[in-house]
Amino acid sequence: MPLEPGDPAPPVTAATQKGERVTVDFEDPTVLFFYPADATPGCTTEANQFDRELETYRDAGVAVYGVSTDDVDSHAAFADEEDLGVTLLADPDAKIAEAFGVEVEEGRAARTTFVCAGGQICGLYEGVRPDGHARNV
């Protein structure tokens, strides 16, 4: 069961598609979107739409991270293929998904998005349709 609004947002340390380790403490406004797999149709749509909205999010002071159970190499290939600027976090052991209570089935995280700020969950979107989701958050 996913964490809910009002729950503390667990800090995350993970590698990006560039192989850099980042730590996100969720004190600042942050969107964390979990998606099942790199380079699949729905996930490609969702990642591209978050990427297109990235400047709007940044202008509002909101960081955006995509998370899947794919590894850094997969994220790098996906980001290069799609020319993505959005930061993708590798979660090959599903530890981030587990910390947020995101269901992982057959090695793939359920499509779930969290809006966080002040170290807590402020919003939760589950079972979303990829098309238009980035704009609706």
Pin down the residues of each PLM region.
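Chalcogenol-based redox active-site neighborhoods
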Residues: 1-137
